[in-house]
Amino acid sequence: MHADLGVQPDTVRRSELPGGVRLVTESVPGVRSVALGIWIGIGSVDETGEQAGAAHFLEHLLFKGTRRRTAAGIAEEMDAVGGELNAFTAKEHTCYYAHVLDTDVALAVDLLIDVVTDAELAHTDVELERGVVLEEISMRDDDPEDLLGDLFDQTLFGDHPLGRPVIGTEESIRSMSRETLHSFWRGEYTTPRMVVAAAGNLEHDRIVDLVGDALAAATRGRGEARSMPPRAPTGVRPVRAGALGLQPDESEQAHIMLGVATEGRYVHARPVLAVLNAALGGGLSSRLFQQVREQRGLAYQVYSSTVRYADAGSLAVYAGCAPERLGEVVAVVRDVLGEVAVDGLTDAEVARAKGSLRGGLVLGCEDTASRMNRLGRAELDHGRQRSVTDSLARIAAVTPAEVAAVATELLSRPLTAAVVGPYEALDELPVSLRDL
């Protein structure tokens, strides 16, 4: 693992364009595609109560047409070259992206910038997409695991914006006006908040020219504006340790997430927490998978995950099981977390976790879309790029003692839990959940 298996120092280039748009590219020889994304440093945490779900609503709406293109025209242009066009919204950012052949990168640049900067937002389209978003909320409500994720965030982060679902609520979407959406778009989708990331068979200077030409017609955010720095923590600690949330659901399984809040992404060294997470529940050999599924057969699916935002994050365990076995699952998970908090992980567990992270990182570099995502997130979150070689070295440097220290710090905290399943009230849940 000593060779540079990913980003070479001279293949990632960065430019800042007039208006404050940041452009980061990575040349990947030997491929015939380019993945290109326009990242906006705006997500659901930036919404007011009235705007809840606006960032995600806009993600749908911007594809409905611009002054130069109809919705059908947008789809036809991309289909005609066999490309992919899509978008996603998260708590702290939104990304509009395309994946095309290298010969069609000019089309991808023009189309994406047109969609992001010159959308129509017609009243009829707002009403049409309102119904689509409401259907998406219904789909979320019919998927216990998706519903659980939102419930856990709400239970852990409470009234902080991190606790709100990205998709919004049925009430907020039904009441959201075209004026609210237009104001959010005009006020937040400014060029200093934009990052253009591209990876594949490309030339940086050509992408600079294409993006600059496409942005020349934009009517806002030009001039001497400078790019915005990475999102800073607000100083608010959005934590409700020991809370328990329940969403009754007539499902055959009980679905549970339990975990703890972590500090924001600028506090803990990311590789240490990532190693801890991988060893706890990141794979088939992980401590939780072995204890819950392999040795006791209590659940088909069990894993841990970690997310990091500017203000805070979480380290959480998910499991789905028969309702009558929920108490036993919770007891085993709590025992595992308690053991790791006190005794740490074995050297072998740490070594396997580090190997898993190394392999996942390098394998992800074989995909131009993954590389583009890495570029965009790094620029938005940190304002800099870190080579894969550097990332591999940081993973390799993690020691069992460092992992043990973070495990003791985090896993000694009171657990927060959320449950989706066939229970009507909190007092129907197992005692092992009610004494967190």
Task: Report each predicted region and the residues it spans.
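N- or domain-start disorder-to-order transition segments that initiate the globular core
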Residues: 1-33
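Charge-rich, well-structured scaffold segments of protease-associated domains
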Residues: 10, 16, 27, 71-227, ...
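M16/MPP (pitrilysin/insulinase) zinc-metallopeptidase core fold and M16-derived inactive scaffolds
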Residues: 30, 35-99, 282-298, 309
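Histidine-centered active-site/metal-ligand motif
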Residues: 56, 60, 204, 255
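A conserved active-site cap/scaffold subdomain adjacent to cofactor or substrate pockets
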Residues: 265, 272-282, 288
